[in-house]
């Protein structure tokens, strides 16, 4: 583009490329906020596989989440980034991202949106559902706490992710 923005070229070929495959997730990650939250009795982040649905994780205090997910298309084994991610807690939208382009000088913001430590050490790509302090990337929106959720009652909290691609193929977890 004239501004140097990288854009998703797929939006120009939707009439020529078929896609009926919804994005898929494999794991979520829970981030207790330093000094303010715990996950499974620990102050360390915890990765939870999604192949064990309904398995509760005990958390308390201020918690953020993230998801490991990819988009796929018909007729290929390639994986792609997920265009739209929304996190709902008890049916309230606490975070959303819609990635359809970015400027070269926004790379630092992308690294802050992802769990860069997981990527650098394990080549594992988690998208945070939290806006870290200083991250002003225009593709992210969150609640007043930047996507952080306060768990302060002994009751089930229902976290639900909604993933969607350019074609409107959607899957929830």
PLM feature segments, named:
Residues 1-24:
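Conserved, short, structured surface segments that act as functional micro-motifs
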Residues 10, 29, 97-98:
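Short hydrophobic alpha-helix segments
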Residues 33-173:
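Long, low-complexity serine/threonine/glycine- and acidic-rich segments characteristic of extracellular
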């Amino acid at each position: 583009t004239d501004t140097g923005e990288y854009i998703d070229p797929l939006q120009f070929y939707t009439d020529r490329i078929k896609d009926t495959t919804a994005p898929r997730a494999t794991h979520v990650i829970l981030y207790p906020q330093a000094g303010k939250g715990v996950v499974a009795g620990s102050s360390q982040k915890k990765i939870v596989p999604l192949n064990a649905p309904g398995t509760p994780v005990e958390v308390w205090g201020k918690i953020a989440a993230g998801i490991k997910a990819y988009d796929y298309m018909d007729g290929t084994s390639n994986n792609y980034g997920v265009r739209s991610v929304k996190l709902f807690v008890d049916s309230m939208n606490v975070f959303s991202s819609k990635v359809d382009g970015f400027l070269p000088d926004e790379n630092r913001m992308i690294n802050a949106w992802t769990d860069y430590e997981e990527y650098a050490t394990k080549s594992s790509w988690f998208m945070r559902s939290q806006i870290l302090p200083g991250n002003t990337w225009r593709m992210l929106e969150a609640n007043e706490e930047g996507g952080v959720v306060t768990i302060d009652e002994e009751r089930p909290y229902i976290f639900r992710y909604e993933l969607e691609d350019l074609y409107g193929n959607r899957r929830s977890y």
